[in-house]
């Protein structure tokens, strides 16, 4: 079992929430940005916990303010099917979680939504990214194969 806790307090410049306090959708980032490897990120107050045991990964990623894109999990399995359960709670700003494999967006999970889905595994790596624009957000995930 691997358990990681981290706390990050950094001073940084953030992307302004230009679509208002009641709209949590991304206003600045487009799909090509997500696939283009824009991974620079400004984060404040990050608390992360995760565990991987055999064919299962679980975790929580909580940040008081994030602007940019950060990878929160990478999962690989030799099983035929992988099941993802991802919950995104955004209190401020804009946020989106994307699952990417082989430079393709597999799923998008919008702010304040929960989604369970399965993928047919092709022995690829599946990466979960959090994208935020001045977002206060918590992501919880459970992956099983």
Model feature map: region roles:
Residues 91-106:
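Short, surface-exposed beta-strand/strand-loop-strand elements in extracellular ectodomains
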Residues 126-131:
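Short, aromatic- and glycine-rich surface loops/edge beta-strands on solvent-exposed regions
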Residues 63-65, 71-82, 117-123:
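Extracellular and analogous surface-interaction loops
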Residues 95, 132-145:
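Edge beta-strands of jelly-roll/beta-sandwich modules across compartments, strongly enriched
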Residues 7-11:
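C-terminal motif of bacterial Sec signal peptides marking the signal peptidase cleavage site
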Residues 109-115:
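Short, solvent-exposed loop/turn segments in extracellular or other extracytoplasmic domains
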Residues 16-74:
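Transition segment at domain starts
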Residues 80-90:
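A short beta-strand element within beta-rich, extracytoplasmic domains
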């Amino acid at each position: 079992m691997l358990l990681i806790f981290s706390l990050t307090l950094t001073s940084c410049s953030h992307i302004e929430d230009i679509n208002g306090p009641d709209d949590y959708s991304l206003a600045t980032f487009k799909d090509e940005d997500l696939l283009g490897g824009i991974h620079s990120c400004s984060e404040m107050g990050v608390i992360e916990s995760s565990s991987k045991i055999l064919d299962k990964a679980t975790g929580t990623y909580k940040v008081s303010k994030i602007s940019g894109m950060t990878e929160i999990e990478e999962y690989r399995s030799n099983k035929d099917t992988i099941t993802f359960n991802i919950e995104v709670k955004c209190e401020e700003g804009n946020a989106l979680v994307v699952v990417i494999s082989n430079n393709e967006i597999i799923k998008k999970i919008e702010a304040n939504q929960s989604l369970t889905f399965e993928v047919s595994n092709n022995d690829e790596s599946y990466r979960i990214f959090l994208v935020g624009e001045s977002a206060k957000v918590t992501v919880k995930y459970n992956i099983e194969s």
